[in-house]
Structure formats: structure tokens, C-alpha cells
From Swiss-Prot:
LRR repeats lie at residues 339-359, 365-386, 387-407, 410-430, 436-456, 457-478, 481-501, 507-528, 529-549, 553-573, 580-601, 603-624, 632-655. Interacts with numerous extracellular matrix proteins. Interacts with isoform 1 of MSL1. Interacts with isoform 3 of RASSF1. One of its GO terms (biological process) is positive regulation of cell-substrate adhesion. Residues 192-227 have a biased composition (Basic and acidic residues). It comes from Mus musculus. The gene is Ecm2. Belongs to the small leucine-rich proteoglycan (SLRP) family. SLRP class I subfamily. This is Extracellular matrix protein 2. Residues 1-19 form the signal peptide. It is found in: Secreted, Extracellular space, Extracellular matrix. InterPro entries: ECM2 (IPR043184), Leu-rich_rpt (IPR001611), Leu-rich_rpt_typical-subtyp (IPR003591), LRR_dom_sf (IPR032675), VWF_dom (IPR001007). GO terms for molecular function: collagen binding; collagen V binding; heparin binding. Residues 96-153 form the VWFC domain.
Amino acid sequence: MKLAVLFCFILLIVLQTDCERGTRRQRRRMHQRRLRKSSSFHLRANRQLEVQQTTAAPDARLPTANSDYSVEENIESLLSNLGVESSYSVLPGKKGYCFVKGMIMYNKAVWSPEPCTTCLCSNGRVLCDETECHPKACPYTIKPEGECCPICSDAEQESINKLHKQVPPPQMEMDQVAIKEALQSEEDEEIAEGHKEHKKETSVPTKIHGDGERTERKLRPEKEGRSAHQPLYHGRREEEESKEETEREGEEEEEEEEEEEEDAIRGDVFRMSSRVIPGTPRGRPRLPRSCSLSYRTISCVHADFTEIPPITAPEVTNLELVGNSIISIPDEAFNGLPNLERLDLSRNNITSSGIGPKAFKSLKKLMRLNMDGNNLVHIPSDLPSTLEELKINDNNLQAIDEKSLSDLNQLVTLELEGNNLSEINVDPLAFQSLESLSYLRLGRNKFRIIPQGLPASTEELYLENNQIEEITEICFNHTRKITMIILRYNKIEESRIAPLAWINQENLESIDLSYNKLYHVPSYLPKSLLHLVLIGNQIDRIPGYVFGHMQPGLEYLYLSFNRLSDDGVDLVSFYGAYHSLRELFLDHNDFKSIPPGIQDMKALHFLRLNNNKIRNIHPEQICNAEEDEDSALEHLHLENNYIRTREISSYAFSCIRLYSSIVLKPQHIK
């Protein structure tokens, strides 16, 4: 019996709590509905105001007769309440047709004679209707509170009012009346709904309360026993409070979701994100004037520095000090940049005596060092062993001894162009420790022979603009990986090239001997050669079978600006290259006709014969008449010769797919 009474009492408390929560929830919903309805009612009131302003009473007019005996009838428009007098005639004698400005309009035809006017032909009568034209532009913008961007307000009604000659009532009065009516109607609805819900919610508690009064008399003797169950009651009370908190949190989440949905629907308004925009990092290093920081690079280009600026930035990996007036590098110049990987000190006035013995000691991760355009007379000592690229071009280097590059076993690129180096002041063991070197530039120096002791790992060797006269048999004995040799602008003669100088090189693919003293194409070329450049020599002959031993075969042969003539080339001159040659440059020579063998070069894509003395092109010199396949030629240059283009046979270029790839003009007239 005690448990039953206790259960009824707890149930009464729970129902009362649910009733209070439902009342609060109902008030919140009614408040939100009131806000939505007030805003929608305000918009409807504005629209009704616009319609009322544009509405005018039609004037009754009598039919009038026109000069062409047609009757003009003015009636009220069927499309709106606005009556507009029509100035269009009805076609006499044609029932159901209308005659408008010389045009016949069929029955039910609709047209617009002018903006904001629509006309209808109905059983021989012209019915016109003038509609409201909404302004295309936004005449007035407002910026709501708490928003970032302006929005367009209601369009002004002045243009419409002037059209109908009406004075609208004050906007403030209409707004106040509309708002009062909306609030009054909503309050009435809320009161009625509140009464209904209150009756439903209070019906059950009333019944329980009546039962409680009956049982109260029975419970009086048991008050003492009820106190024994107080701990149980408090425990359930705490559970109910926790449930209320969870339900309250759920309601708040629902409200937030509703607000998000409203924001998504109202997508024309921009809302600022609640997240904080990150500011400038506090760890940004202090930089001297005229310097900039980009990612991990500090750039101080042309900043008029006379010394290395003191910078402390452990996170920086690149430092550019190009184009300053720096003279010296003290021992502790880069102590604040321990993670530096690339250092550019080009175009300064740094001298060898101004570099401290421990200037680069703190740079344990330095990989690239550029010191072009300074006043160094020898390579700085104690360079980091991590260096992979070292550039000391355009200095005044006088010598390279055995220890200058001794610790740079990871060096891949070494550039020493534009100095005073020669075979006399460069020790034969200077490059011995460079085990990883693959790219070596020694151009614009004073070498007379190929430097001795080149690293075995060398792949590209640049020796242009020197005074080299001879290539001996032992020059490339230890460089079996070499793929490119550049020897242009030297003094090499074919008789001074040893037969075994490079014929056994298995990886050598490119040789540049331009602007030397060659009189014919050198013999004993490497078997692997693909690219041979002999521009600007005095070559007057291509010996037979000079390319015959090459595998897979020569692909690029450049012989421009030489002295080749018809007598210097025969059918066996290109033997071994007919199947492989892709580009052949024979321009600026002394040819008087197309060289023999051109039509047999099946892989040829680019042929230059311009600026010669060619006068005639025979049908089978470029295209073979016995073959039906098209030529692979894509570019053929024959300009600046003495060819009479009108006398060229129609079969001369029949194998070339595109005539636009043939250049014939201009020609010399003589």
C-alpha cells in the first residue's frame, strides 16, 4: 500500500513537470511563429500598398471613328483592373481580325507595342493592358546591424506614382497599422490555442488530484513510514533532474539546427564565421630593411649591404644576398641560420682574404653555394661537405690545388667559368676527390688542352671559349660515363684530334665543335653519337662512310655556315645515317643544287638549304617517284636562293603532306 501511494505521488510530480515544460515550449514556438508571421505580413502589406498605388479607375469613353472608317473601341482590360485606352484600329470587313499599324493580327493574338503594355486581339477588338514595371536597378541599399554586406531595400515608388499621378499614403502609418493588425490577430490565435492545450494538459492531473484527495485520509496514519523512503525519493529526483538537463540540451540543439536551416534558406545574406582568423605568427624573425621573407627564404637583393646582416632565423633554409657591396664574410656571419640549405652571394665584392677560416663552419646543411661575380682568387677553404652545387663563375681564380676541393665528395655540379684557369695552375689531382661530380663547366678560361684528372663520374663537360688546340688519346680515358662534350669557340683542327680520342666512348651522344678550324667532318667519331654540331667552321667536304660505324645512327647533323659545295658531298657521304637522320642543317653554304641522297632519308623531319646558290629543283631530288608513301618532312627551307618558283615541277614536292611546310620565298633575282 505504501509503494502504491508513493508511486502516485511521484507520477503527480512528473506530470506537473511535463506540463510546465510543454508550456515553455509552446510559448517559444508561438514567439517564433509570431516573428515569422509579422515579417511575412509586413511584406504582404508592402505589396498591397504597391498594387493600390498603381490601380486607377477606368474612364468610360465613347467609340470614335478614324479617318479610314474604322471604329476604335475603348473597353476595360481583361488582364487587370487598369483600363487603358487603345489607339489601334479594328480591320473593317474582317470579322475577328485586328488591324494594327498596317499589320493584321489574328484572333487571340498577343503583342507588346511598348514597354509595360500588353495587347490582345479578341473578336476584332484590341484590348490593351498596362502592367507595373519593376525597377531593374536597386535604388537604395541598407546595411542591417550585425551584417557585413549591404542588401537591396524595397524599390522606390516614385516612378510608378508619377506614371499614375497618385500620391501614396505615408509609409510609416501603413507599417504601423499593418503591424498592429498582425499582432492583434496572432494574439487572438495564441489565446485560443492556449485554452485548448491547457484543457488537454490539465485533464489528467485534475483526475489524479481528485484521487489523491480521497486517498489522503488513508495516508495520514502512514506518514511516519513514508519518511523511511526519503533516500529513494531523492535518488529518483536526481534522475529526473538529469533527464530534464539532457532534454533541455536537446531542445537547444534543435533550436540551433533550426537557425542553421533558416540561414541555409536565407542564403543571400553573408554571415561572418565564428572561427578566429589566424594572425601573423609571433615567431617571425626580425629582418633588416630592404629584406623580405617568403616561406623559408629571406631575400635581400640589391639592398646596398656592405656586410652580412645579422639574422637569427633557425627555420630559414634559403638566403639571397645578390647584388650588394659585401666585402667580407666573418667567422660568425651565419651562426643564426643553422638550417640554411641554399646561399646566394653572387654579384658582390667579396675577396678571398675577407672570408674567415670558419665562415661556413656553422652551415651543416648547406647544399648550394653561389659566389658568381666576386673577386675571389682561390676557392674558399673549409666548405661544408654537404655541398652538392658550387658556382664560382666570373671571378679571378688563379689556381686550384689538390686540397681546394678535397672534402666535397657529395658535389654534383661545379661551375668555374670566366676565370684565369689553365692546365698550368690546375693540379691534375684537383678533381680527384669529387666522386659524385657529373656536371663540370670550365668555359671562358685559358686551357690549351683538355684538363687532366677529370672525375670518372663526369657526364657533361663544358670547355667552350678556351684556347684548346689538341685532343689527345688520354683525355677521356677515365671518363667512361660522359654523354656531352662542348668544345665550341676553340682552335681545334681535325688533324690534331687523335684517332682513339673518343671512338671507344660508349655513352657519348653529343659533341659540339662549332667555330673551330675544321676543314672536313672529323673521322673516328664515337659509335654512340646522336648529335653532332659543326657550325661555323671551314668544312668543304663530308668524307664517305664517316657515319657508317654509328649505332643506332646519327640523328642531328648541323653544318650551317661552312663552305660545302656540290663537289664536297656524294652518295656515300651520309652512308649509315639514311635511316636515322632527323634534322639536317646545310644552310649558308655554297650548294648550287640539292645534295644527293636527300630523297633516301626516310626519317628526315627538318631540312635547311636556305641561303645557298641553288637554281633548280629536279622532280626526284626530294621525292622519290617510285614510292607511294609520303615523306616525313615537316619543315623544308629553300628561301634566299636563286630558284624560279614558277619553273618548279609539280612533282617536285608531291611526297610532302603539307605545302605550308615548304618555305620558298624570298628568292634572289639575278
